[in-house]
UniProtKB/Swiss-Prot annotation:
Residues 1-126 form the C2 domain. It comes from Arabidopsis thaliana. Ca(2+) requirement for activity depends on pH. Active either under acidic conditions with micromolar levels of calcium (PIP2-dependent) or at neutral pH with millimolar levels of calcium (PIP2-independent). This is Phospholipase D alpha 2. Its EC number is 3.1.4.4. Ca(2+) binds at residues 187, 371, 405, 722. Belongs to the phospholipase D family. C2-PLD subfamily. It is an enzyme of class 3 (hydrolase).
Amino acid sequence: MEECLLHGRLHATIYEVDHLHAEGGRSGFLGSILANVEETIGVGKGETQLYATIDLEKARVGRTRKITKEPKNPKWFESFHIYCGHMAKHVIFTVKDANPIGATLIGRGYIPVEDILHGEEVDRWVDILDNEKNPIAGGSKIHVKLQYFGVEKDKNWNRGIKSAKFPGVPYTFFSQRRGCKVSLYQDAHIPGNFVPKIPLAGGKNYEPHRCWEDIFDAITNAKHLIYITGWSVYTEISLVRDSRRPKQGGDVTVGELLKKKASEGVKVILLVWDDRTSVDLLKKDGLMATHDEETENFFRGTDVNCILCPRNPDDGGSIVQNLQISTMFTHHQKIVVVDSEMPSGGSRSRRIVSFVGGLDLCDGRYDTPFHSLFRTLDTAHHDDFHQPNFTGAAITKGGPREPWHDIHCRLEGPIAWDVLYNFEQRWSRQGGKDILVKMRELGDIIIPPSPVLFSEDHDVWNVQLFRSIDGGAAAGFPDSPEAAAEAGLVSGKDNIIDRSIQDAYIHAIRRAKDFIYIENQYFLGSSFAWSADGIKPEEINALHLIPKELSLKIVSKIKAGEKFKVYVVVPMWPEGIPESGSVQAILDWQKRTMEMMYKDVIKALRENGLEGEDPRDYLTFFCLGNREVKKDGEYEPSEKPEPDTDYIRAQEARRFMIYVHTKMMIVDDEYIIIGSANINQRSMDGARDSEIAMGGYQPYHLSTRQPARGQIHGFRMSLWYEHLGMLDETFLDPSSQECIQKVNRVADKYWDLYSSESLEHDLPGHLLRYPIGIASEGNITELPGCEFFPDTKARILGVKSDYMPPILTT
């Protein structure tokens, strides 16, 4: 039997196993020893802990809770809603007995994919087989039910958002909210001379917003509460730095501002990730420097409540899993929640306003769309010099600093309360003291969740909140799998997981009609479909579907003869010393991900008579960089970098990457996702890094009969103006061949200028071709002359790590 593609949704129920004999599990001498050891060292239960999993070949897609004290007839009665995009011969149900370290295999049941391919419901008792495919002792069977729904049966497949009645992403913890308002931010600040003229519907022009100024105003004007979560919060930075836009009190640091607000009686609470090991393996590569202990010390003994919050595991994992979670994973949500004046003013009532996205309130984040390397070193960046990619980099040795490109948003209306509730859930689980503002007691001042714009207002938004988080980090999750499923949560091996960010991405990609534009700090995943080139793909476990969904979407459009384009912007390399083991390992995973996608695209082009077409006309990858000529009056450092280092080479060549830290996807100019979640397994898993994101659209600006021309379109055009240094008519339709070829041509030219021996003028734009080649079969190769990133000895295609576990770098 050949493998078949399962692309759609799988509804599965695992009921029970009948008359199980525990020979495969804990019986006999070994079982009694293990039980005694567990009781002696205080782990485990000294009894069977049976659970079942669902796999599509070697990709784990579902797992039940553990059942104790039922060694012969475990009953789970758990249902699963599974997004799939896998090649498989069988759906495999595995029964295991959990141990403190690892698990004992009982056996596996197999249902051929061809039995479910046409959508029939299959409800059967399946033989449980051992590794040799023989029935296990006693002839046990597992009772399961399966039904598959292919994407073509999805009423939203390829249809975009058809109307304002679109209900949002199904099976999620938070429902979609209407009557909201969203402000979109590119970078921490927009100076007054960044003014692209971008026409929108209704005769308006796009107007950019200023993120850190708005956050400064929101904190300054709060009267009752200021709640902040971050991967890092650094007390010594200032939010307002534009000398042409001074603000009263704007010269204060974040730390002093928060202390001042707390002393005025505002409840100021910070949940900052407690970098426990400060993950030594990564830290030596320059990947982590969060100031967590400095921040805690700064607020000690003040009115500000600052809690360092470790990424604690839920209770369901093995000892090894729990150790992995607490030492390897992070709290990555970046939110600010405040009470605010009413939009109309003149009222004593207050409302909730929230900020969500990729920007932490810490050093190295303040930047503008100009992303200067050298010219702000005596002004905005003199006291905020960030360059973790070179050993020993310092303002005294000069630039290039690492420019920072990021995306954030402000949420108003009912959606802002969902962000508040997320904070309350997290504080209740990990904050300790009961100090949250009691909203009921402020009921006469803070209005309950209500629309901030009327449904007739053409600027109105519908917005939904998504997360990656589990019961170890958020209180209030239901205990039973049935209640969890009803709340849009996934039950794992005794932990409850919110994985809705991944679901939101999958849903949006499947809906897409014309094009997708992604900016993300990482791009790796769907490892179940990687080539087994020096690895065992089943051991990588970067199983999230996003890269595979993108390539399957392109393939489906090629088959249908319809135009569809995907643009992806990533950093040149993940932040850190580029030659280091961790950075090189991540680049290797990224290469394997791109390769998997290009192989899909090239195969589809061949099968549809389009052999010889450039796959970059369908799927194209970019990075950002800058290069500046020296100007009179520039900051002169007092020292020099060490000779023959990346640092001195970059300084002399006057170039460096612009770090892409964004986590954003735009679909058809009508739908946008912005958050803290990267396109990697850490962010998309739900039980690894904690994340938050919004997905939203403007009901009056959909891509139905004509192209969408609302805020999302304006935002994309403004980003492209930032990256390409120009506006062009072809950019209005990213789905066209003319557009993708023009963008590729410009990015190729900019890469040639960036990587050339010398440059007589500033780089005219920042968008660079990602420096890889694509062979005829889709294999990723070196671009001629581009084995290493400029000024480094770091391989562009990365190197597989022999010592770093994939769970750390995926």
